[in-house]
């Protein structure tokens, strides 16, 4: 433990916070090109085939991004917009693709949570 004089001379060193989404370069979103679209299985208590895409961002970073929602039209060479946000049961997947922007279509006929999946407002009768 430092003495009072040592604290006056040097002060305390602030802890550096690690950046969890370094690939985005402090931007809210980044555009990228899909290199591969694949399915992986989640961690232990869960069971599914989760859809992810390997994306090369405009700053040349290669990342894995989760494709949310049921069904998608994404394939190799599709242009997608990527935001931060990890998927808790998929290790190494720290980004989400944004639906309804660029080549990744929104989900048709979705009524609830439409803004998260790029869905159009349903026509009222």
UniProtKB/Swiss-Prot annotation:
GO molecular function of the protein, one example?
structural constituent of ribosome
Q: Which GO terms describe its cellular component?
A: mitochondrion; small ribosomal subunit
What stretches pass through the bilayer?
none
Where in this chain does the entry annotate a coiled-coil region? none
Q: Which UniProt keywords apply?
A: Mitochondrion, Ribonucleoprotein, Ribosomal protein
Cited Pfam families:
Ribosom_S12_S23
Please name the PROSITE patterns in this protein's record.
RIBOSOMAL_S12 (PS00055)
Picking any one GO biological process from the record gives:
translation
Functional description taken from the UniProt entry: Protein S12 is involved in the translation initiation step.
Which protein family is named in the record? Belongs to the universal ribosomal protein uS12 family.
- Cite the PANTHER family for this sequence: 30S RIBOSOMAL PROTEIN S12 FAMILY MEMBER
Please give the name of this protein: Small ribosomal subunit protein uS12m
Organism, per UniProt?
A: Allium cepa (Onion)
Upper lineage: Eukaryota, Viridiplantae, Streptophyta, Embryophyta, Tracheophyta
| Name of the gene this protein is made from | RPS12
């Amino acid at each position: 433990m430092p003495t009072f004089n040592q604290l006056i001379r040097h002060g305390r060193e602030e802890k550096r916070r690690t950046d969890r989404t370094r690939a985005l370069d402090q931007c809210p979103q980044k555009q990228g090109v899909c290199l591969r679209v694949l399915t992986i299985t989640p961690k232990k208590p869960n069971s599914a085939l989760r859809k992810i895409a390997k994306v090369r961002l405009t700053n040349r970073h290669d990342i894995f991004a989760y494709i949310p929602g049921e069904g998608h039209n994404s394939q190799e060479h599709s242009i997608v917009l990527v935001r931060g946000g990890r998927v808790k049961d998929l290790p190494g997947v720290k980004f989400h693709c944004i639906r309804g922007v660029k080549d990744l279509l929104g989900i048709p006929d979705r009524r609830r949570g439409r803004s998260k999946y790029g869905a159009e407002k349903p026509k009222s009768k």
